[in-house]
């Protein structure tokens, strides 16, 4: 997957705006500023990447919470999760025969910092910035009194499928070796972000909105934040969430309040959201300049972005089976799920012989956009070794390619058809 027109437009617009803004701040021409960047001398400081940006933009306005606790609060037993240290990947086999949504106890967890223990009674959400007419603050109770919505949406780690880059390029990447279990679908209840932004009276010149979490520090490298464009923040399915699957939002998943940026990579859906900055300028964080960026020969850098910024999730499929599974011979129902960050799924084709033949899978309702669809095929298994493959196409016509995207340093957004080895005895 090379850089799409949409990704390129997003990158070029943000880059151009940031260059103009930084040049004006430093009192120099755009040409002189670009020359400074090209020289490398003082480039980080010129761009505001020297560690002071987050501290300058942030204020100590967090609600009271205890000292950092563990990386995880809920039990994460090995029979349900693959341990990646600071992340817990859902084992796909646990979804066999289960409901459409993933229960809270089975939902994957990816944290950048330990879980803050926040007292819901003391929680405050602050909306501020130079692009709002007034600063506003909400308690949890005040948020819950606003008109709420419940949406079924996926949250998916941008690194989901990373291990298959290693398979494809014969080169292991740093970080958690995610298979395909870095995704979950839940019913999320909350308030459209638009509603709280409207209370703050967003100015006409607003450009970027940046939710900030309470789990990190206040310096640039430790600020748990990810900017999004104003139009994405105002979308109907961008929420400030306080409920998950009919329960209060659990601590592991961002409780008491998190952001949900539907369809985008998981790091955009900031957990433990404590404030939202609205700016007339381009906002940057470590999660759209160093992480959350595809870096490699096929992803041209344009400072401050060293590559292509990850936004929308792509199309993927997974079998509800362990990798390298062993099955008995006889009649089988082979099942799985497929999903897309932009749409719902139109069709899924399945091969049980390594791609020699394909057959359409039966899709099972519901089939919700930006979530997933369940599917299955019948199979009479005889002893031997097999390679299962699944290839989904969404309603926008996006189809999983045979291979994943060009190599990128962090291993983001793998979407290729995955080989799933199976042995029948």
Language model regions located:
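Intrinsic disorder/low-complexity signal
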Residues: 15-16, 49, 59, 69
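N-terminal export signals
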Residues: 26, 32-55
């Amino acid at each position: 997957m090379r850089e799409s027109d949409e990704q390129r437009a997003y990158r070029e617009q943000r880059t151009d705006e940031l260059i103009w803004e930084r040049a004006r701040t430093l009192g120099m021409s755009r040409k002189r500023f670009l020359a400074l960047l090209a020289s490398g001398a003082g480039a980080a400081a010129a761009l505001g990447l020297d560690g002071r940006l987050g501290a300058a933009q942030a204020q100590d306005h967090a609600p009271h919470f205890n000292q950092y606790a563990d990386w995880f609060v809920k039990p994460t037993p090995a029979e349900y999760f693959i341990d990646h240290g600071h992340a817990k990947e859902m084992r796909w086999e646990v979804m066999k025969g289960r409901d459409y949504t993933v229960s809270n106890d089975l939902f994957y967890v990816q944290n950048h910092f330990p879980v803050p223990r926040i007292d819901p009674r003391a929680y405050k959400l602050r909306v501020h910035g130079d692009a709002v007419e007034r600063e506003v603050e909400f308690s949890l109770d005040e948020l819950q009194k606003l008109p709420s919505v419940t949406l079924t949406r996926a949250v998916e780690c941008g690194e989901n499928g990373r291990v298959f880059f290693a398979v494809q390029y014969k080169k292991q990447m740093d970080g958690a070796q995610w298979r395909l279990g870095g995704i979950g679908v839940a019913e999320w209840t909350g308030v459209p972000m638009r509603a709280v932004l409207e209370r703050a009276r967003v100015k006409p010149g607003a450009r970027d909105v940046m939710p900030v979490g309470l789990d990190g520090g206040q310096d640039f490298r430790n600020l748990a934040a990810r900017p999004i464009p104003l139009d994405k923040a105002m979308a109907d399915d961008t929420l400030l969430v306080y409920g998950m699957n009919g329960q209060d939002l659990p601590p592991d998943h961002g409780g008491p309040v998190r952001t949900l940026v539907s369809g985008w990579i998981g790091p955009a859906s900031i957990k433990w959201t404590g404030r939202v900055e609205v700016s007339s300028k381009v906002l940057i964080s470590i999660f759209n300049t160093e992480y959350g960026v595809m870096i490699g020969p096929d992803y041209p850098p344009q400072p401050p972005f060293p590559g292509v910024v990850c936004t929308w999730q792509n199309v993927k499929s997974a079998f509800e089976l362990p990798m390298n599974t062993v099955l008995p011979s006889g009649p089988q129902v082979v099942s799985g799920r497929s999903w897309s960050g932009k749409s719902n799924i139109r069709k899924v084709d399945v091969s049980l012989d390594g791609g020699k033949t394909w057959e359409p899978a039966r899709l099972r309702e519901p089939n919700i956009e930006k979530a997933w669809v369940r599917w299955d095929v019948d199979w009479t298994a005889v002893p031997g070794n097999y390679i299962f493959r699944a290839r989904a196409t969404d309603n926008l016509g996006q189809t999983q390619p045979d291979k994943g995207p060009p190599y990128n340093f962090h291993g983001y957004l793998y979407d290729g058809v995955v080989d799933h080895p199976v042995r029948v005895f």
